[in-house]
Amino acid sequence: MHRRFILLVAVFIAVLGLPTSAFAHAVLEANTPANDELLKTAPTAIDLRFSERIEPVGAIQLFDGDANQVAVGSQKLVSPNVSRTPITGTLAPGTYTVAWRALSSDGHAINGAFVFHVKKRGPNPEGIIG
């Protein structure tokens, strides 16, 4: 019993000593366009920068203010933690919502959404902080 307790304490101490990144999942650190940014011209791509390496699978969807999907190209990794997705559709003045999904290098799926505005601000969609 005493040996089992010592082993349990040793494992507990070893786990506490691991770097916190061993338990962390990637998080979105920055995006271009920025959340709630008012742009003078339409962007040509959406860049997402994560806190750690992500897998080369993921998805981005772009919606206009009427919830119509706007065409985007294939998402590509431009560095181990940055993805770029070209915008192939036309962006008229208004508010746009970006919904994204990514996969951390540890296999954890992450997702989120943000808005940006082209030439004029419109109302932000419900549930999207902006």
Language-model features: where?
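Absolute protein N-terminus
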Residues: 1, 23-26
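Bacterial N-terminal signal peptides that target proteins for export
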Residues: 1-9
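Classic N-terminal secretory signal peptides
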Residues: 10-14
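N-terminal signal peptide c-region/cleavage motif recognized by signal peptidases
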Residues: 19-21
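N-terminal soluble domains immediately following signal/targeting peptides that reside
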Residues: 25-130
